[in-house]
Amino acid sequence: MTFLPRSRAIRIGFRPAVAAFVASLLVCAFAWAAPAASGDELQLAIILTRHGVRSPLKTNEAMARLASQPWPSWEVAPGIQTPRGNALIALMGDYYRARFAEAGALTGDPAVDGPRVFIRADNDQRTIETGRILGKSLVRLGEPDVHSLAAGTADPLFRPVRAHVGHPDVARAVAAVLGRIGGDPRRLDRAYAAQLAELKGILFGPGGAPLGASPFDEPTTVRPGDQESLVTISGPIYFAEQCTESFVLEYADGMPASDVGWGRVDERALTDLLALHELFFDLAQRTYYPAQVGGSNLASHIIDTLEQAALGQPVPGAVGPSGERVVVLVGHDTNIANVGGLFGMNWMIPGTQANPLVPGGALVFELWKRGGEQNSFYVR
């Protein structure tokens, strides 16, 4: 089955209707911003979500050199969504169902709502499982169809660099990141010295110093990326992102406090350390040119899907058939960072840093029809 008729970067010359949507998206906030006016009707909701809580992508053996104590064990293999991750995603689905039923996009009747929901996921276990659980919670009608490409296929919607969508300029991407930090990545090590020192104290215990050579002794560098990303950031900032991501996953999975950062990471410390995590993604994924390359194809299909709902007829490039009321796109933290950077979106969640990329977090695009006006829509 073909889900996307074409893959491409955002066009320079938009059709008038699409240009209006883009202007709305650039001005509007994400998720639920200002309340809709009385009498307005929700025509379509597009949920761009990260998968749920998973185990770290790297094995404990691969992470061993980053700490003086063994990392906690997980009940699932690396990169697999956990049972608690499944349960938390189900709660998100319950929330979306209640909200969209109240707004009129869903009815609460599974037989009616089933055909109104379309789910498109990347082909990892964690993304497919998130789509499946969200679909069950949204509709409550058996097992939903989760549309994805064959396993092992680089999906141009979620992994455009690996799928070779377009011809990105790697040197330009590196220059764009370096331009934000004065051309010297070592400035990051100095600017975030306090957070790095706190992290090393957690990783290596009192004194924050390993017995031998530490990867944190290497300076941060910025260079051309690999098949997944245009830009590679290595050194302390990269290792800090890996470690803080592990702490977030341990905490979100409900591990005992003694296992979250070996008992040395409480909520305050986790909030502080997230500054290092979000710094990495802000530079590598939200810098405008990398965000444009990584997010423009996905954003273009989102815009086509909004246009299809407004016109009430099929539009090439739209995700799902005409008539859907909820479209779920299940991807990764990089997808949310790319689209957020492309559209200039910023968000805050209590207990985190700016623009957090939490498991199960989402950007939600809503198309509303103005009450009492013919063919008048807005996006928020």
Model-derived features: where do they sit?
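Signal peptide processing junction and immediate N-terminal pro/mature segment
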Residues: 31-36
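Intrinsically disordered, low-complexity regions enriched in Ser/Pro/Gly/Gln/His and often acidic
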Residues: 8, 25, 64-67
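Intrinsically disordered, low-complexity segments enriched in Ser/Pro/Gly/Ala and basic residues
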Residues: 4-6, 23, 37, 213
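Bacterial N-terminal signal peptides
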Residues: 17-29
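Signature for phosphate-centric chemistry
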Residues: 37-116, 122-327, 331-380
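Intrinsically disordered, low-complexity Ser/Thr- and Pro-rich stretches
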Residues: 5-7, 19, 153-154
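N-terminal secretory signal peptides that target proteins for export/translocation
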Residues: 1-14
